Each structure stands twice: as C-alpha cells, then as structure tokens.
Amino acid sequence: MAVTSHHMIPVMVVLMSACLATAGPEPSTRCELSPINASHPVQALMESFTVLSGCASRGTTGLPREVHVLNLRSTDQGPGQRQREVTLHLNPIASVHTHHKPIVFLLNSPQPLVWHLKTERLAAGVPRLFLVSEGSVVQFPSGNFSLTAETEERNFPQENEHLLRWAQKEYGAVTSFTELKIARNIYIKVGEDQVFPPTCNIGKNFLSLNYLAEYLQPKAAEGCVLPSQPHEKEVHIIELITPSSNPYSAFQVDIIVDIRPAQEDPEVVKNLVLILKCKKSVNWVIKSFDVKGNLKVIAPNSIGFGKESERSMTMTKLVRDDIPSTQENLMKWALDNGYRPVTSYTMAPVANRFHLRLENNEEMRDEEVHTIPPELRILLDPDHPPALDNPLFPGEGSPNGGLPFPFPDIPRRGWKEGEDRIPRPKQPIVPSVQLLPDHREPEEVQGGVDIALSVKCDHEKMVVAVDKDSFQTNGYSGMELTLLDPSCKAKMNGTHFVLESPLNGCGTRHRRSTPDGVVYYNSIVVQAPSPGDSSGWPDGYEDLESGDNGFPGDGDEGETAPLSRAGVVVFNCSLRQLRNPSGFQGQLDGNATFNMELYNTDLFLVPSPGVFSVAENEHVYVEVSVTKADQDLGFAIQTCFLSPYSNPDRMSDYTIIENICPKDDSVKFYSSKRVHFPIPHAEVDKKRFSFLFKSVFNTSLLFLHCELTLCSRKKGSLKLPRCVTPDDACTSLDATMIWTMMQNKKTFTKPLAVVLQVDYKENVPSTKDSSPIPPPPPQIFHGLDTLTVMGIAFAAFVIGALLTGALWYIYSHTGETARRQQVPTSPPASENSSAAHSIGSTQSTPCSSSSTA
C-alpha cells in the first residue's frame, strides 16, 4: 500500500496538470477585453508632425553653402525623463535628385543631445559642418559621409530672432529656420527652391513638408492576450475605429504597423499573420525590422509595405472584403478561416500607428508555466506550499462603495520605465480607461517592483498572495503592503503576504468585459511604514500597519519620495457572472427597444412597407425611435451610411451621419414629440431626419445602415455618454464619447430600390403605393400624359369660347343694319336689277348705307 500511495502522488499531479490545461473553453475563444498596458504586444499610438515656427528662403542660392538652423525647445517632461537622443533625417527636396552643395547645420538645444544622422541621396565628398550646443555630439552614418563632415561646439543665442540674425551675420543668409520641441525624429529636406521667398522671416504658422518633427503619443486601447503554448506562428488581430479624431476628415490615412523584437539582443524568427480591420478608408503600411520569417497581412483596405530596408520579413498581402467588426466576430472569422492560434486582439478607438513587439521563442518557452491560471501555479511548484491553505484573519477593509468606471488614477512616484517601453500619457485620451495590464495574468514586475504573486477570486471576494521570499530578496524588507484603500492591509503566514478584498470594497473596481463576464481591478501599494511602526516584518499573523500616509503626496515630497512608495502592482481577476455582484447594475439597455422606419413624406404618417424605392434627387425620410422606461435615458444616431452591401461592417464612402454629426449637406432634422404609453413609466423617443438621395453606386439595390446608441440626459453618468445635439457633436465630440457609444450601439438596416427617372411615371410600378398595381394590358398605345391632355383640352375650350364670342359680335352688329333696310317684297320687274345692285352695294360698303338711304 505504501508503494501504491507513493506512486499515486505523481499520478495525481499529472492529472491535476491535465485538468488545468484542458478545463474551461478553448484558449482561442477566451478573450475578455481589458485596458492594455506596456506588456501588451501591440501598442496604439498617434503620430503627428508639426513645428512651432520657422521660415525658408532662397537667399543662399548665390552663396557657396546652404545654412539650416534648428532651434530646439524643452518638452514638458520631468528632469528624469529628458530625452537625450535625436535622429536627424536628411534628404533632398523633391526638385533635387542628389544633393551636392555644402551645408552648415546650426543645431541648438537646451540640453546636451546625441544627434544620430540618417541621410539619403546626399553626395559623398561634400564638406558639411555641424555646429552644436555645448556638450552635444553628432554621430554620422557609416561610409564616406564622415570623411568630409565636421562638428564644432558653439554657444548660441536662445531667442529665435537673435539666433537668426547671428546665423545671417555669420554666413550671409539662411536657407531654413525651424523652431520645434525636442522630438525623437526630425525630418529636414535640404536644397534651395526658387519658389522660396528671398529672405527668411520667422512666422508662427510655418507649415512645410520640408521641415517637420515627429511626435508619438500613446493612445488608450483595449485588448487581450490569449494563453497558448509557445509557437513560431502568431496571429495578431488589430481593430481600429477611426484614424483621426477629426470628424470632418475624409482623406485616406496611412496606418503604420511597426514590427520589431521586444528585446534587441536575441534574433526573432516568426511566421506572422496580421488581421487588420478599420471601417474607414485607410491604407495599412507594414514595416518590419530585425525579425525574420514570413508575414501575411489580411485586411479589407489597401495594404502597402515599407521600403526595402523596412522589410526584414517575407511579406504577402490578401484583401478580404468579408472581415467583420467587433472582437467576437473577428475571433470567430480568424478561426473559421484557419488562422490559429490567435495570439492577441487589440481594439483602439483612435490611432494612426501601431507597434507590434515580438518575444523570442526561447524566452517564451521559459515562461510556459504562465499559461496556467495564476491562482493554480503553486500546485506545480512543490517547493512552495499553497499559501491559501493557512487560515486567514477576516479582512479589515472598510467598503467604499465599489464604484464602477472610472476609477482614480494611481499615483506612481518613482516609476521607472525601461527605455524600450512607451511612456504613459499623463492624462489618457479616455479618462475612464487606465492603461492596466492584461487581466489574465497579474503584472509581476511593474514600476520597479519585482515580486511574485497569485490571484484568486470568487463571487464574494478577491485574494492576492505575494511570495515572501521574492519580496524580501528584492530589497523590500521593512516595506509594507496595502491595497488601494490603505485601511486594507496585508496579513502574513509562513510563506506569503495575503491581501483580501470584497468585490465592492478596498478600492476594487470592476467593468463588464463580455455579456456574462466581469473584470475586477485593484492594486498592491508597496510603501514604507509610518514612523510609529517597528522595522521589519512581524512574525505570525500580525497585521502589517500601513501608517498614516496611504499615498504619496500627503506628506513632504522631498522627504518621502525615496521611501514612501516603492511601487504599485496592478492585478485583476475575471469572473463569469452567475448573479449580479453587489453594487453592479444590469444591462443598461435591458428595458430599451430600438426601431427604424422609412417614410415617403415629411409628415411621417405611414411607414413604407418592404423595399423603399427612391430616385435621383428624391428625399428619404427616416424615423428612429427608442421605447424605454427610464426618463433620463436618451439615444443618438451615431452613424448612418448607404452601402451596396447588406453587411453593416463593410463601410462605404456615402456617409450621411458620422458620430452624430451630419456629413451630408442635405441632412435635415425634424422635431417630434415624446409619446407616453399607458403602461406605467414607458415612453417613446423619436428622432426624424431626411436626406437627398444621390446615385453614386452603379446598382439598383442599396442598404441604409444606421447605428443607434444610448446616452444619458443626466449629467455625471458613468455608464453612458452624455446626450449631445448634432451641432455640438460636430465640434465637441471626443474619443471618450466615441469609445463609450460603441459599447451600447444597435445597428438597423433598410433596403432601398433605386428607380430610374422616366417621363411616363404613371406606368412605372412603385413600392410606395399601399395597393398593388395591376399589370397593363398587352397592347396599349402610350399617348400624352394627363397634364398635357388637360392643357390641350383647356386651350381648345378657350379658343372655342373666343371664336364663339367673335362670331356673336359680328352677328349682332351686322343683323341690326340689315333689319333697318326694308326691301319691297315684290318690286316691279324693271326695278329688280337696280334694287339688287343697291342692296349688294349697301352690304359690301356698310359705311355708305346711310347716305344712300
């Protein structure tokens, strides 16, 4: 029996490991969105090019050398975040193929910098002089460029006008002058153009494609990393809502996807699949550096690749029009088309650049254990017994209400990010979304805190255990642990520090990730104990006092900055919602029903049944409505567009309304009254508008797609965006509202039959009529239309009346004259001829009848 028991233990461990690997749904389908952080493989950014001021001239045309001045200004970053390297890209202007003229560069900066030069089409053997500020250096590209290039340090004037006059006095004239904030990349095109003015006069609104600085701003996004075994093939899905926050932008935008290794040293070899989706008209530009292997890019938009030097991978592209939107549909589409396993999904509301950083295969194999849920990893490590087997003291946290999104920003004093990480924005574009780690795996190393932890949660509480050895061996002995609420302090057993939080207390926040899933967030705060506490960790299960100051900033910053906060570790836990957790409301639209109808006239009386027929330059009248019980609940028409496709995910250029703002000049809104139902607390809100149809598609069947979204008339709502008018939406709508509207939208589609305009309209069948039109007889002569016939009949009537009147006038005047001339009834035969002549003469000349008589 002893032998049997001895062999049963590894068998049980193997079975438990198998259960861990196979329990639950397939890894490829378990994607619950959460705000991404720096550890996410895909980062969303907004790239912009701008300068502060500057000028350009052709004043150096007759001089032996060009003179280009760069006057850099400090950024708003703190002293510890100052940039120390700038890459200066030099290439000729468009009218010059290869630049041969000597150049002088004045590179003035408020701090010492390392200038990295990257040149294109600049002839070798040409003298070039670089004047830099004190302490700065210039690193030249490899080759013969450095043989004729010199660097000198100078003490420059700081003001623009003083520096410009100094350069003009020194060299006679200036080719270009550019003032800009320090940037990682500066692009200068050298050369002289005759269209430039003769002198350089600095202007604030200096806009030129020849002199630009590149700035990258991180953008908030949501995503997930799906757990899977390390594999040389990776599938990454990126969904972009809009490339620009400007609602009036209608130009095609280049979206750059930059692919590089996550670490510089090891070589990365991957077979990569990118599935890219954006409803807007964009051009995806793919660039890869220092990554070998094959890359396949799939998108419904146009796809391009970088230059030869920007294509380290073998790239192929495939344009597919059937790629859907939303996370669930995209994941299903990828699996149905054989693109598996899906590695990550990323959704960004606004961005024009994405950075994809790939891990080395060997490093991924070392972290293979991380694919197992964190709360169960301890079972695979026999050296560390389960920390949660020991009894815990009941939590002392005082619930604070458990408010849903947004949760307050976590101060990160002393946060030290690696140089390879993207700096976090001070105020994210989406205030309600913080850049947090992926919810599937707690961030073990973040903000300089290197500790091992595991998270376990149920439908009542969340428990996080921190390994004591890893905590103390990394130099945190004497520090203490709390949750966001400083009153929720850690307990300690023999091997772990344990922190426990109810789902609606200790600063825990939550948000809905899927219809039946909720993600809960909190943070471990590592800080120095208050002066009244003893140093070192107590033995047994003694509470760890957090001190008086739970967060930095409460005391003197100069004294407490090194010790008051060693760091913050963000952790989270996902739950399938079996019942409503405390303080969590149900679906916002559970009691709201949308509807959309099309009408023939602006009276909006009877909706058109079936397919709505429309001709060129005819109005389409649209009514959308919502039936709801909450009087503070409103709705908005987020987007309406016409498309030849029935799938609303396939965007077209015929946009009528975009983000509540009318895009078509013919859009007209109509007022409507709110209708109250006899049912208690039920009412219908309606919105009506019309637009003039223009036939831009060569097809007889079109589809009107409208996305409706819920909004709140009550200020301060955390669940829904504030209701705005179309006029306000055109000027004040930001990415925050767009992000929130996407979570509560409903799409309606109505078919439209395009009919041709003909002269014989009474013979053209129309679906607008409520009664069916019988087919015409087989042999019918199509004559004039009704209006023409009525016009002719009326004209004939008028002509007949005029003729009758004229005849009556003639008859009335000639009849009286004849009656006044009495002729004998039986004249003598001798007088007959004379009388007849007299009468004939009288009738022929009525004016002379009186004299004759």
From Swiss-Prot:
* Compositionally biased spans, kind Polar residues: 820-836
User: Which one Pfam family would you cite for this protein?
Assistant: Zona_pellucida
Q: Which residues carry this modification: Phosphothreonine?
A: 842
InterPro entries, per this entry?
Answer: ZP-C, ZP-C_dom, ZP-N, ZP_chr, ZP_dom, ZP_dom_CS
Q: Where are the transmembrane segments?
A: 790-811
According to Swiss-Prot or TrEMBL, what is its membrane topology?
Answer: Single-pass type I membrane protein
Q: Which residues lie on this side of the membrane: Extracellular?
A: 24-789
Superkingdom, according to UniProt?
Answer: Eukaryota
Mind telling me how this protein is modified after translation? Extensively modified by glycosaminoglycan groups (GAG).
* Cystine residue pairs: 55-200, 640-706, 661-730, 711-723
Instruction: List every stretch annotated Disordered.
Output: 530-559, 820-853
Q: Which residues are glycosylated?
A: 37, 144, 493, 535, 546, 572, 591, 698
Q: What are the boundaries of the region Interaction with TGF-beta ligand?
A: 737-751
* Compositional bias annotation for Low complexity: 838-853
The protein's GO terms of the molecular function aspect are:
activin binding; BMP binding; coreceptor activity; fibroblast growth factor binding; glycosaminoglycan binding; heparin binding; PDZ domain binding; SMAD binding
From the UniProt record, give one GO term of the biological process aspect.
Answer: positive regulation of cell migration involved in sprouting angiogenesis
Taken from the record's topology, the Cytoplasmic segments are 812-853
Describe the subunit structure: Forms homodimers and homooligomers. Interacts with DYNLT4. Interacts with integrin ITGA5:ITGB1; this interaction promotes the internalization and trafficking of ITGA5:ITGB1 into endocytic vesicles. Interacts with TGFB1, BMP2, BMP5, BMP7 or GDF5 and inhibin A via the ligand binding domains. Interacts with ALK3/BMPR1A; this interaction results in the cell surface retention of BMPR1A. Interacts with ALK6/BMPR1B; this interaction enhances BMPR1B-mediated stimulation of the BMP signaling pathway.
State what this protein does: Cell surface receptor that regulates diverse cellular processes including cell proliferation, differentiation, migration, and apoptosis. Initiates BMP, inhibin, and TGF-beta signaling pathways by interacting with different ligands including TGFB1, BMP2, BMP5, BMP7 or GDF5. Alternatively, acts as a cell surface coreceptor for BMP ligands, serving to enhance ligand binding by differentially regulating BMPR1A/ALK3 and BMPR1B/ALK6 receptor trafficking. Promotes epithelial cell adhesion, focal adhesion formation and integrin signaling during epithelial cell spreading on fibronectin.
Q: Give the protein name, as stated in the record.
A: Transforming growth factor beta receptor type 3
Organism, per UniProt? Rattus norvegicus (Rat)
Taxonomic lineage = Eukaryota, Metazoa, Chordata, Craniata, Vertebrata
